[in-house]
């Protein structure tokens, strides 16, 4: 939600939430293509890693259940402090699957995917295809790479019901554009003593 929220200028509405069933179909198609290219069986595996803030279980529960319902495994970890991020767990999972000999390719989606660069480079050096999916605005390190395939989430068919309103000060159209407020003006009244 953070990367998408930064693009939208606020919390995503239902129309702008990514559809994980579409991402799942895309992963299956990629695994099929990789199977065809290598002549071996490549089975897609999808895992999502998330932190759960104290008292936040009810907020993430519907999302986690929806992910599990479409075939994604979910690793959930309590967010107890700034150092309790899930990136080390993601890296450990990638390394474990590689050590088990079942990793035939890797697709990484992360708002902070640059944390995976060293592992990605090692896998690429071994000949494994690596794709990073995310948003161009937040993954310049992957977009600029000669060895990583980058796919913008909006380029995956069916992920978003509507095109994202990707307007920023860095990419203004010639005719100009309205930048929507991050919150309603009435939020200024919240917390005021009446």
Could you describe each region identified by the protein language model?
Residues 1-84, 129:
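Domain-level signal for Mg2+-assisted phosphodiester chemistry and nucleotide/NA-binding surfaces
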């Amino acid at each position: 939600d953070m990367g998408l929220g930064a693009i939208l200028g606020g919390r995503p509405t239902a129309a702008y939430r990514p559809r994980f069933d579409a991402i799942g179909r895309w992963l299956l198609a990629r695994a099929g293509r990789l199977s065809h290219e290598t002549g071996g069986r490549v089975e897609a595996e999808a895992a999502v890693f998330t932190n759960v803030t104290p008292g936040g279980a009810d907020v993430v529960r519907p999302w986690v259940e929806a992910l599990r319902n479409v075939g994604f495994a979910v690793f959930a970890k309590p967010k107890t402090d700034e150092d309790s991020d899930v990136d080390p767990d993601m890296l450990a999972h990638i390394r474990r699957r590689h050590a088990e000999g079942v990793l035939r390719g890797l697709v990484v989606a992360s708002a902070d995917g640059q944390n995976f660069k060293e592992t990605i480079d090692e896998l690429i050096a071994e000949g494994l295809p690596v794709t990073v999916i995310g948003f161009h605005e937040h993954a310049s390190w992957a977009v600029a790479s000669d060895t990583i395939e980058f796919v913008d989430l909006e380029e995956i068919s069916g992920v978003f019901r509507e095109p994202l309103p990707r307007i920023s000060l860095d990419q203004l159209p010639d005719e100009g554009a309205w930048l929507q407020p991050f919150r309603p003006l009435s939020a200024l009244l919240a917390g005021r003593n009446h």
